[in-house]
Regions:
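Alpha-helical transmembrane segments of multi-pass membrane proteins
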Residues: 81, 110-126, 148-168, 186-199, ...
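Long, contiguous bundles of hydrophobic transmembrane helices that form the permeation core
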Residues: 2-19, 192-307, 462-464
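Membrane-core helix-loop-helix motifs of multi-pass transport proteins
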Residues: 4, 143-250, 398, 420-457
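Membrane-embedded alpha-helical segments and adjacent helix-loop junctions characteristic
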Residues: 59-144, 299-390
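C-terminal transmembrane helix pair
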Residues: 111, 198, 354-464
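Structural signature of hydrophobic alpha-helical transmembrane segments
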Residues: 15-22, 75-77, 132-133, 280-281, ...
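Hydrophobic core segments of alpha-helical transmembrane domains in multi-pass membrane transport
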Residues: 22-33, 45-53, 81-88, 121-124, ...
Length: 464
């Protein structure tokens, strides 16, 4: 009996050491980013090295494996993020983004300005960063108010409802891309499920926009540098070619996910689908299409084209570094045997263990968002940690739902340390209190709705 008790004690002690390493790692990341305002890349690398030094393994390999994990992660997502940045910048420069917005306004009409702005934000925020989308659409909200004399707050919140949801849930925006890489989620599946979760969340956000506008009408105020009408462009591309940079990668990646299992293995069609549906190739082709459209419409000089591409790649460079550091951090947590320790703490059926992981992913992303302000950093860090905790027996449902739980959680907790908070407030002319009641509350609604839809889908469509 004594021997059995001693064995149990040793087993418990062995399980607690990885948990303590995890807690120390969280403390380092949050302390450096929030307390000392250290760049997320530096904080994650320091945390990864610390975890690697404490984890089992030969001392000669402890730093080497950090560098190897960094290279592996950068190799898996570097091209995709760089190409996504090129697509976003060139779509704005060519007028393709403006053309898509005009199409939604024309289809739904200015009398349905709220749904038109939500739909525009929803679609454009898939390839374009949120702040750029908001900057593009806010003049339309002001123009609609000038024409109707009402519903300004509804238009502003409607933009955020669409743009914020896909920013956190649908690749190829950086956060969802990293979630897919860290959790080894099929990118096409995350596009489909992410959009499925984001759509009803955005719809509820639009309803909240209408309700809040009635309860708290806000006048349109003058904002320096923001016009009340969209900036006219000399020429816009046709709608058919304007949507190619968005539609092409979605069709190629999702098409591979859907149709490849139905094709004969090693056939010409299957091999072609495998190549074209690879996320790297799909985003490269989409970037080529977007750059070609920009050249055709704007006829830039080689110098202007080079500067535009350099600008887009520089914007993606820091994201690649932070993403690779997050993947390195997750790999070192795996080396510290965090996963088996967490599995033993929540021993039971795969389904109950999976539900605990969903809740953990949502809450961890929310806490990180609240602590340091960035949804992207919250998604990178939370997915890296959760990747090391997935039970060996699986979750009882597809890991894609853990990804949408993390993405949903990263929306909750936006306040004055979030750059998005200030972009929304300053460009719309709202006060801090009005922003808390509209922006911060909206993101709670989007995040909680996304989390609940994710939970329901694990039962209705587990995809296990």
């Amino acid at each position: 009996m004594a021997a059995a008790g001693g064995s149990a004690g040793l087993r418990g002690e062995g399980e607690m050491i990885p948990i303590l390493i995890l807690l120390l790692a969280i403390l380092i990341v949050v302390g450096l980013i929030v307390g000392l305002r250290i760049n997320a890349f530096v904080a994650l690398i320091i945390a990864a090295i610390t975890v690697s030094l404490l984890a089992p393994g030969d001392w000669g390999e402890k730093i080497v494996r950090v560098a190897q994990a960094f290279g592996s992660t950068a190799g898996s997502i570097g091209i995709v993020i760089a190409m996504a940045a090129v697509i976003g910048v060139t779509m704005m420069a060519s007028g393709a983004a403006d053309r898509i917005v005009q199409a939604f306004i024309g289809l739904l009409g200015r009398e349905r300005g709220g749904p038109a702005l939500t739909t525009s934000g929803f679609v454009l925020s898939i390839p374009v960063f949120f702040d750029t989308v908001f900057y593009l659409l806010i003049p339309l909200a002001r123009s609609m108010f000038t024409q109707t004399g009402k519903d300004y707050l509804k238009y502003v919140v409607a933009i955020a409802a669409g743009a914020a949801a896909t920013h956190a849930l649908v690749p190829p925006t950086p956060g969802p891309l990293v979630i897919a890489a860290n959790l080894s989620i099929d990118l096409g599946l995350l596009i489909l499920i992410g959009a499925l979760v984001a759509l009803p969340a955005s719809t509820l956000g639009l309803l909240y926009a209408g309700w809040l506008n009635r309860k708290m009408p806000v006048p349109m105020r003058d904002v320096p540098g923001v016009k009340s009408d969209p900036e006219p462009l000399p020429q816009l591309p046709g709608l058919g070619v304007a949507v190619i940079p968005i539609v092409l990668p979605v069709v190629l990646i999702a098409g591979k996910t859907i149709f490849l299992p139905l094709l004969e293995a090693e056939s010409f069609i299957a091999n072609t689908a495998t190549i074209l549906g690879d996320p790297n190739m799909a985003l490269i082709l989409a970037a080529i299409a977007s750059v070609t459209l920009y050249i055709h419409i704007r006829r830039p000089s080689r110098t202007c084209l080079g500067e535009l591409l350099e600008q887009s790649l520089m914007s993606g460079g820091l994201i690649i570094l932070i993403t690779a550091a997050g993947g390195t951090f997750g790999a070192m947590l795996q080396a510290a045997d965090i996963g088996p320790a967490i599995s033993n703490l929540f021993a039971g059926s795969a389904q109950s263990s999976g539900l605990v992981m969903l809740l953990l992913g949502f809450c961890m992303a929310s806490l990180l968002k609240f602590a340091q302000g960035s949804s992207t950093v919250a998604m990178i860090t939370a997915s890296a940690m959760l990747a090391a905790m997935i039970p060996a027996g699986g979750l009882g449902f597809n890991v894609v739902y853990l990804g949408t739980a993390i993405g949903s959680g990263s929306l909750v907790g936006s306040w004055m340390n979030d750059s998005g908070f200030w972009i929304y407030a300053k460009m719309s002319g709202l006060t801090e209190v009005e922003t808390l009641k509209s922006w911060s509350a909206l993101l709670v609604i989007l995040g909680v709705t996304g989390g609940l839809i994710t939970l329901v889908l694990t039962f209705l469509l587990p995809l296990a």
